[in-house]
């Protein structure tokens, strides 16, 4: 049923595109590009909406495949030298019937790493529009989120799509894909024909179609073509909701339909919203906006979720209602005091104690909604979006950074784990459904029983073979082999005795007395030792001891979280006759497969905003200046004099305290 619907949508989309798309004017496009990118507005991208990815007709026909490969070759050959060559390169979709809101070509940005089987696909965010009025307003204010006519040829994105290891310690060398947001439907729409209710504009909403088409067109350029490939579908804000709604469908498309040996995971950043009563009544309630948007976009929702809400399927746009039905592993990052949630709740920038009280309750409600999430990272901060920010490595909970927690979760969801994570972390999150939360314990028990059974069978088989009588031919063959072994051993001993008789000196390894330990390598080492003077040998020993001490010191001082670097053993350098000055041994740094300190469920213990050291700074909405921490506490309605008395300090000392010191004291008091 769903496949037939999508076939019709694709056919209609081709006709509609030819009818409505307008030729682009190069000069006007250039002027719009310069004007737009000189001052891009900071868009609050709350992803309250999305719908599932679709089962459309297979786009990988021969002609389409040739076009995809040509696009990739053009992008690959256009890369120059320097930092510009590391940028993400633009590619339009080969299926031109799938478009942005205004009918312009949808597409993606790609930076391919030839030796990597990992793919990071990032869905952009940017709010949504849900009726004629809101879409017109969006077109006037945020046109770059509804058309591709202003897209540049290259993009540089930080965070999890950064190619720099200091900014992206674990995924800097993966294949990176950015899908710009131009459908205004939180990646959920399937409307291929223009909305006839708006006579002035002709909007299409194809977010789910765009995502599926991009994934399909990545296959010819390497996605899942090698066994053991991995796809991490990540999204921020509207993209975060898009990840949750499309994750299972994308996995089914790759694994079941395309028969690819690939592991699919999802990461939702700031896309987890609540349908609460707003602080003040808005012109259109958030629930009503979601319901209207679902109809306008013709959104497809996951069937497993809509079964739970048959009369109100649009409820599946909320993460806490959708999550229990997911089968593909999902990692959730969410600020406990999300700015987009505040916008949805119409609370505004927190200034008064009443606003702070409402926000405090909002944080508690959001924390409770994450109870059944098996992999979560939720700092007690006011913010929105983090995965694309260049300082995302600084966000920490309990000394575990966000990239480290994400890396731990990535390894915990692998089918075969032969590392320390299997013993040191919380239960695995390989399946996100709450009914399977304890399956890992039972699986380990079954594996133990199977190993015991296998060992018993092997032992019984060995005993049986031992008592069986060998035939005459088998006994003779075994006897012949033993005699040959004895002859070889005797011959080796005669050769060794002959060397000794001829005056050759053999260096015997005290740890291994086998004949193999005396060979040409030992003789060469002995000659080199004889050539060195006593002072040079002593200098060599000092250098080796110093290198070992430095290595042990680095291992002791290695941090428990953040960017984990471990030094390899110092390189051994050959000494020459004139090598009297010692050279420092070079150390090769590498990132370990799993951080030393892991955690799969990291929720901030304190319940008030900005109590985390790594929270983003706040600005006063009235003045635009950065708010001091005491100002924030005052706005929160706290009695500062009472706080000073509780901490045992005077007001002068309290006012002069640094933010980190004050947060430490308050956190210790709270604990």
Swiss-Prot record:
Localization in the cell: Secreted; Cell surface
Glycosylation sites: 95, 372, 578, 612
Alphabetical UniProt keywords: Glycoprotein, Hydrolase, Secreted, Serine esterase, Signal, Wnt signaling pathway
Function: Carboxylesterase that acts as a key negative regulator of the Wnt signaling pathway by specifically mediating depalmitoleoylation of WNT proteins. Serine palmitoleoylation of WNT proteins is required for efficient binding to frizzled receptors. Also acts as a regulator of long-range activity of Hedgehog (hh), possibly by regulating the switch between low and high level hh pathway signaling.
Similarity annotation: Belongs to the pectinacetylesterase family. Notum subfamily.
Induction, as annotated: Expression is induced by Wnt.
Record field: catalytic activity: [Wnt protein]-O-(9Z)-hexadecenoyl-L-serine + H2O = [Wnt protein]-L-serine + (9Z)-hexadecenoate + H(+)
Source species: Drosophila melanogaster
Its EC number(s): 3.1.1.98
Pfam families in alphabetical order: PAE
InterPro entries: PAE/NOTUM
Protein name as catalogued: Palmitoleoyl-protein carboxylesterase NOTUM
Region ranges (Disordered): 411-592
Compositional bias ranges of the Basic and acidic residues kind: 470-486, 505-514
């Amino acid at each position: 049923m769903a496949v037939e619907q999508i076939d019709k949508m694709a056919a209609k989309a081709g006709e509609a595109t030819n009818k409505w798309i307008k030729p682009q004017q190069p000069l006007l496009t250039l002027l719009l590009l310069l004007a737009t990118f000189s001052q891009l507005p900071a868009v609050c991208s709350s992803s309250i909406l999305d719908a599932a990815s679709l089962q459309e007709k297979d786009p990988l026909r021969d002609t389409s495949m040739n076009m995809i490969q040509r696009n990739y070759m053009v992008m690959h050959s256009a890369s120059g030298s320097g930092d510009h060559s590391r940028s993400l390169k633009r590619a339009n979709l080969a299926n031109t019937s799938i478009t942005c809101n205004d009918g312009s070509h949808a597409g993606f940005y790609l930076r391919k790493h030839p030796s990597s089987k990992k793919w990071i696909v990032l869905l952009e965010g940017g709010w949504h529009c849900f009726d004629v009025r809101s879409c017109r307003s969006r077109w006037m204010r945020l046109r770059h989120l509804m058309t591709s006519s202003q897209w540049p040829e290259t993009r540089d994105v930080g965070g999890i799509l950064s190619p720099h290891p200091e900014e992206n310690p674990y995924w800097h060398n993966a294949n990176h894909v950015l899908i710009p947001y131009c459908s205004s439907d939180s990646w959920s729409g399937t409307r291929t024909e223009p909305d006839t209710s708006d006579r002035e504009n002709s909007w299409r909403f194809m977010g789910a179609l765009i995502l599926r088409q991009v994934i399909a067109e990545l296959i010819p350029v390497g996605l899942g073509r090698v066994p053991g490939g991995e796809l991490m579908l990540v999204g921020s804000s509207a993209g975060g909701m898009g990840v949750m709604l499309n994750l299972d469908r994308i996995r089914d498309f790759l694994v079941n339909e395309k028969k690819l040996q690939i592991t699919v995971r999802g990461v939702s950043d700031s896309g987890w919203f609540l349908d609460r009563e707003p602080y003040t009544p808005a012109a259109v309630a958030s629930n009503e906006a979601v319901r209207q948007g679902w109809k306008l976009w013709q959104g497809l929702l996951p069937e497993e979720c809509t079964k739970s809400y048959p009369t109100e399927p649009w409820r599946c746009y909320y993460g806490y209602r959708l999550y229990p039905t997911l089968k593909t592993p999902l990692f959730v990052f969410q600020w406990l005091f999300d700015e987009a949630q505040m916008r949805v709740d119409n609370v505004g920038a927190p200034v008064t104690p009443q606003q702070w009280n409402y926000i405090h309750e909002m944080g508690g409600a959001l924390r409770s909604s994450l109870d059944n999430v098996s992999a979560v990272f939720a700092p007690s901060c006011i913010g929105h979006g983090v995965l694309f920010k260049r300082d995302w490595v600084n966000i920490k909970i309990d000394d575990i950074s966000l990239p480290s927690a994400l890396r731990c979760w990535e390894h915990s969801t692998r089918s075969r784990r032969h590392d320390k994570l299997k013993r040191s972390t919380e239960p695995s999150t390989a399946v996100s459904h709450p009914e399977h939360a304890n399956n890992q314990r039972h699986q380990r028990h079954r594996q133990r029983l199977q190993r015991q059974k296998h060992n018993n069978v092997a032992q019984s088989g060995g005993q049986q073979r031992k008592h069986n009588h060998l035939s005459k031919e088998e006994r003779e063959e075994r006897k012949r082999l033993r005699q040959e072994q004895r002859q070889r051993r005797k011959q080796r001993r005669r050769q060794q005795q002959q060397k000794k008789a001829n005056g050759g000196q053999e260096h015997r390894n005290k740890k291994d007395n086998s004949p193999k330990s005396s060979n040409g390598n030992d003789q060469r080492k002995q000659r080199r030792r004889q050539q060195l003077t006593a002072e040079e040998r002593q200098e060599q020993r000092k250098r080796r001891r110093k290198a070992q001490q430095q290595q042990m010191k680095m291992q002791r001082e290695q941090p428990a979280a953040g960017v984990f670097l471990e030094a390899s053993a110092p390189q051994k350098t050959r000494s020459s006759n004139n090598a009297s000055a010692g050279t420092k041994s070079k150390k090769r740094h590498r990132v370990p497969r799993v951080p030393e300190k892991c955690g799969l469920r990291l929720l901030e213990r304190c319940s008030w905003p900005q109590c985390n050291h790594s929270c983003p700074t706040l600005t006063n909405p009235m003045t635009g200046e950065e708010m001091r921490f005491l100002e924030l506490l005052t706005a929160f309605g706290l009695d500062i004099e009472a706080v000073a008395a509780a901490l045992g300090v005077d007001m002068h000392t309290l006012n002069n305290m640094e933010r980190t010191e004050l947060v430490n004291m308050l956190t210790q008091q709270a604990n």
